[in-house]
Amino acid sequence: MQMGDTVFMFFCALLVWLMTPGLALFYGGMVKSKNVLSTAMHSFSSIAIVSIVWVLFGYTLAFAPGNSIIGGLEWAGLKGVGFDPGDYSDTIPHSLFMMFQMTFAVLTTAIISGAFAERMRFGAFLLFSVLWASLVYTPVAHWVWGGGWIGQLGALDFAGGNVVHISSGVAGLVLAIVLGKRKDGTASSPHNLIYTFLGGALIWFGWFGFNVGSALTLDGVAMYAFINTNTAAAAGIAGWILVEWIINKKPTMLGAVSGAIAGLVAITPAAGFVTPFASIIIGIIGGAVCFWGVFSLKKKFGYDDALDAFGLHGIGGTWGGIATGLFATTSVNSAGADGLFYGDASLIWKQIVAIAATYVFVFIVTFVIIKIVSLFLPLRATEEEESLGLDLTMHGEKAYQDSM
């Protein structure tokens, strides 16, 4: 065990933990004032629910030795997860690796809530969160990072393009379709863009822990991830704003923040495998394709992805996974692989197989989970509750005295 790496990873885990409250602000600013507390509660309660699931059995199912589909139960209740280095890093405590990975599981579950904002009942969300973290997140994490079949295939996902972003985006799309549109349609008027700006800034800050920490040690790969993360976020702003300026004639603050998130999502699977120049291309295209996902794709198919969980995370994560297959190079990370632009066409096909499998699995299992939840609890607020606002009807409080 090395003290330097331990302190580094401890700090990275705290940064990723901070992303979930940041997400609450980011989402909270984009909803109506009568729904800001209920929206924040989805993110905050994810910390509570998923933390418990992770300690009891989530971590062992994701990372314990098992088969190519799911981990075993030897680390259930964190049995054997102590302060000595574990299987995934020989320089940090096993328990620290567990906590770092827990923050990913928490954030992934919270991201989904953006898709059904302003209409899902809180109790139904809690039950859904338990089941989804257990039955969807843990298998996908095992496939990619825990010794499962995607990792064995040779597909690359440095920090969670598949595990975090595609899985949360696709799950959000399923819930948006099943719950249907909001009572007053899909148009949403953000009630406080300063909240969204501050939340976006916290998310960007936390993302350094998310991507850089995925190196698990403070080395050259970590530094590439650090540079690429910031560069792709900046390029994502440029890509989004450029398209927005051309189409809508005005660049917006919401567009700038959304572009940063799009760039960050897109670089996530590639952060420790590509050059800084590639991160510019990945970020710019990420901003542009997520703009298309948020505006054109959603309009074409008519689903109400309220805060664009699929438009940002599903679309951005998909592009990031494909981009990894194009731009990855062993000159950055010898543990990775060369992509198409560096002479190896096989990686891009491995990336596509991994992405497609994640889409299919997450879509089907999320659909089954939400149908099971509906057998026990009503999923959606009534028209009257939606009209009054979920802050008051679900939680008995208001964020503002005039919040209607």
Curated annotation (Swiss-Prot):
Induction: The nrgAB operon is activated by TnrA. NrgB is required for full induction of the operon under conditions of ammonium limitation. It comes from the Bacteria. Keywords: Ammonia transport, Cell membrane, Membrane, Transmembrane, Transmembrane helix, Transport. The chain crosses the membrane at residues 7-27, 44-64, 96-116, 125-145, 158-178, 227-247, 254-274, 277-297, 352-372. It is found in: Cell membrane. It is a multi-pass membrane protein. Its main location: membrane. GO terms for cellular component: plasma membrane. Interacts with NrgB for a correct localization of the latter. GlnK-AmtB complex interacts with TnrA. Functions as an ammonium and methylammonium transporter in the absence of glutamine. Required for ammonium utilization at low concentrations or at low pH values, when ammonium is the single nitrogen source. Required for binding of NrgB to the membrane. Interaction between GlnK-AmtB complex and TnrA protects TnrA from proteolytic degradation. This is Ammonium transporter. It comes from Bacillus subtilis (strain 168).
